[in-house]
């Protein structure tokens, strides 16, 4: 039986500052590093073998995976002290466009809470110059179907 393991990146500096992050490279906080270690502890505790790792190209996601895999002691995924991981921008999180870098509370005060809620939670209404959730699905799904789904169907365990 194969497993698909989904791990969200640990807290980033902009998560802490309540800012829209999108595709901006923002480092993990100390709390984010601890969260990544806890993910690794859970993988180890449940004896989950991982065959493949896929990630966005964003450093916070890559660092989370690296910390978790080291903590889980999955040496099969490390070569020459580097994590064996496929990085692809099709797996990046949502692009918030013109909202990137803005404080969420200040943005709600400027544009109205309802409008910001629509931009964040509506399926097909993107923020200005950003992606809707529909756009994200359109970007991620073909990559997932082509590169990840076949591995799962072959019985491999994949961490994203």
Residue ranges with predicted function:
Residues 39-117, 145-146:
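Phosphate-coordination/substrate-recognition cap region in phosphate-metabolizing enzymes
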Residues 10, 55-58, 90, 121, ...:
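Short, well-ordered beta-to-alpha junction loops that form the rim of enzyme active sites
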Residues 11-67, 71, 108, 126-142:
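Loop-to-helix element that buttresses phosphate recognition and phosphoryl-transfer chemistry
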Residues 114-128:
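Extended, charge-rich low-complexity interaction segments
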Residues 1-5:
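Extreme N-terminal starter segment of soluble prokaryotic enzymes
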Residues 18, 76-77, 150:
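Short secondary-structure boundary/capping segments
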Residues 135-160:
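GST-like fold's C-terminal all-alpha helical module
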